[in-house]
Amino acid sequence: MTAPAEVEVRGVLDRLTDAWNSGDAAAYGRLFTEDADYVTFFGANFPGREAIESSHRALFEGPLRGSKLTGSLGGAAKVRFVRPDVAVAVVGGGSSLTGAEVADEGRESTVSFVLAREGGEWLITAFQNTRVSDPRG
């Protein structure tokens, strides 16, 4: 795949980080397709842009107020193109509830994204967040 498309995909992930770090649920939601699926680390599914935005508004105004995603999602992601208009990105990252630059213990995740090019722009159509844990318990 061409480098410009990969740069655009990485840019979406960086804008996602910026929206989270700003607590901007509307900007966060705009990065998803209307029919996106958003699966949280605990298995809940928020289907559709509206549900993704409203759930994040509640989080950003409540328990995740002031939280930060650590690192650069776009910079760290492994990106591959399934077709010219569909990309998969996988990235390790984490979050800090105190706004620190390093993830809080137990808040490291591996996140998988499927992005689709719609109307000339890349949007996230599927999101899966999985907490990193020791398989030995």
Task: Pin down the residues of each PLM region.
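Short beta-strand edge/turn micro-motifs at domain boundaries
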Residues: 106-137
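Short, low-complexity N-terminal intrinsically disordered segments enriched in polar/charged residues
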Residues: 1-34, 123, 135-136
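Short, conserved clusters of charged catalytic residues that mark active-site
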Residues: 11-12, 71-74, 110
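A solvent-exposed, acidic/Ser-Thr-rich amphipathic alpha-helical stretch
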Residues: 25-87, 91-92, 105-106
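A generic structural motif
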Residues: 39, 96-98, 116
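Short, cysteine-centered beta-strand-loop-beta hairpins and adjacent loop/turn segments enriched
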Residues: 95-105
